[in-house]
Amino acid sequence: MSDLANTAERRGEKRPAGGNRRGNRLPRDERRGQLLIAASEVFVDRGYHAAGMDEIADRAGVSKPVLYQHFSSKLELYLAVLQRHVDNLVSGVRQALRTTTDNRQRLRAAVEAFFDFIEHDSQGYRLIFENDYVTEPQVAAQVKVATEACTDAVFDLISRDSGLEAHRARMIAVGLVAISVDSARYWLNNDRPIDKDSAVEGTVQFAWGGLSHVPLTRS
C-alpha cells in the first residue's frame, strides 16, 4: 500500500470503491462496476434523497463528469444499482430451488437463499426491501419485479408438484416468499440474535407446517 493510502487509512478516510485512485483509466465495464459499488454504499448509508452525485463520485474516486458519462441522473444510477442487487437475489433463489427434488429440502434451500443474500449482500437487501424511495414508480416497479420473480420460481414448483389450481398455488408461493423475507429481515435488523442455520430452520419448520398439508405428488 502506498504512503498516501496508509496516511488516508490512519486518518479514517474511505478509499475509493475498488481501490482505484482518482484519474486511473479503466475499461468502461470495470468503471461502471466500480461506480455501482460506490453508489450502493452511499445510497445505503444516506438514503436516496440525502445521497448526492458529488459524494458518490468522491466515494468512487472519480470526478462528477466521469460519473455522468455513465449515468445521466441520480435516478438512473439508483435503478442500475437496484437492478444489480435484484438480479443477485432472484438468481440465488432460482438456483436454490434446483438443488434437490426433495420438497422439504427445497423449501429449506429457498428460505436459506434469502438469508444468504442478507449475509453476503446486506446492502442489496436493504435497498430492495427497505429503500426510502418506493414512491417513485420506476423504483416500486423494480422492487415488485424482484418479489414477483422469486414468487414465480416457487409457484412453478408448487404447480408442477401438486394438483392445486393456479390461484391457490400462487397464494401459497406468495406466503412462502413473505415468510422468508420477513424472517430474514427480522434476523438482520436485530443483529442476528441466533445463528443463521437456526434462523433458517425455524422459518422452515413454520412454513413446512402448512406446506406439508398441500397434496404434493413428490415429498
UniProtKB/Swiss-Prot annotation:
<keyword id="KW-0010">Activator</keyword>
<dbReference type="Pfam" id="PF00440">
    <property type="entry name" value="TetR_N"/>
</dbReference>
<dbReference type="InterPro" id="IPR001647">
    <property type="entry name" value="HTH_TetR"/>
</dbReference>
<feature type="region of interest" description="Disordered">
    <location>
        <begin position="1"/>
        <end position="30"/>
    </location>
</feature>
<protein>
    <recommendedName>
        <fullName>HTH-type transcriptional activator FasR</fullName>
    </recommendedName>
</protein>
<keyword id="KW-0804">Transcription</keyword>
<comment type="subunit">
    <text>Homodimer.</text>
</comment>
<comment type="function">
    <text>Transcriptional activator that plays a central role in sensing mycobacterial long-chain fatty acids and regulating lipid biosynthesis. Activates the expression of the genes encoding the fatty acid synthase (fas) and the 4-phosphopantetheinyl transferase (acpS), whose products are involved in the fatty acid and mycolic acid biosynthesis. Specifically binds to three conserved operator sequences present in the fas-acpS promoter region. Essential for M.smegmatis viability.</text>
</comment>
<dbReference type="InterPro" id="IPR050109">
    <property type="entry name" value="HTH-type_TetR-like_transc_reg"/>
</dbReference>
<keyword id="KW-0805">Transcription regulation</keyword>
<dbReference type="GO" id="GO:0003700">
    <property type="term" value="F:DNA-binding transcription factor activity"/>
</dbReference>
<feature type="DNA-binding region" description="H-T-H motif">
    <location>
        <begin position="52"/>
        <end position="71"/>
    </location>
</feature>
<dbReference type="InterPro" id="IPR036271">
    <property type="entry name" value="Tet_transcr_reg_TetR-rel_C_sf"/>
</dbReference>
<keyword id="KW-0238">DNA-binding</keyword>
<dbReference type="Pfam" id="PF21943">
    <property type="entry name" value="TetR_C_46"/>
</dbReference>
<dbReference type="GO" id="GO:0000976">
    <property type="term" value="F:transcription cis-regulatory region binding"/>
</dbReference>
<dbReference type="InterPro" id="IPR054129">
    <property type="entry name" value="DesT_TetR_C"/>
</dbReference>
<feature type="domain" description="HTH tetR-type">
    <location>
        <begin position="29"/>
        <end position="89"/>
    </location>
</feature>
<dbReference type="InterPro" id="IPR009057">
    <property type="entry name" value="Homeodomain-like_sf"/>
</dbReference>
